[in-house]
């Protein structure tokens, strides 16, 4: 496989191990993503804050206008050792970017496996 730009193997291992823990550690921000997966995956969650709750005096998230709700992000790749898919999901003023990614990766890997099995037959 051709490498587009050089990456220090130690740096790559540090980053990919940290991204695995986002999904596999009980303290990971995407722990629910990794439940019942049949593949290894690494990911990173992110939030872009659109408002300061105190500044606008909102008492609950439900009272915040949609245009001021946070943007949610999730980047991931799978399988970890030999990735065949990498993606970034951005949900404007919403949630569940990691849930969307899970559906996409599940389906992609299911189709990829089916195609591989057909080629082998």
Set out the residue ranges of the language-model regions.
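Active-site beta-strand/loop architecture of penicillin-binding DD-peptidases
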Residues: 1-4, 10, 16-115
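Short, highly charged C-terminal tails/helix-capping segments
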Residues: 117-121
């Amino acid at each position: 496989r051709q490498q587009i730009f050089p990456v220090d193997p130690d740096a790559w291992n540090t980053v990919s191990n940290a991204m695995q823990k986002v999904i596999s550690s009980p303290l990971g921000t995407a722990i629910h993503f990794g439940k019942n997966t049949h593949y290894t995956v690494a990911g990173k969650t992110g939030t872009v804050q659109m408002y300061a709750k105190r500044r606008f005096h909102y008492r609950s998230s439900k009272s915040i206008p949609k245009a001021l709700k946070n943007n949610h992000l999730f980047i991931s790749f799978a399988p970890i050792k030999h990735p065949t898919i990498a993606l970034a999901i951005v949900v404007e003023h919403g949630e569940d970017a990691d849930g969307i990614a899970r559906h996409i990766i599940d389906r992609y890997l299911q189709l990829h496996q089916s195609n591989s099995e057909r080629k082998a037959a």
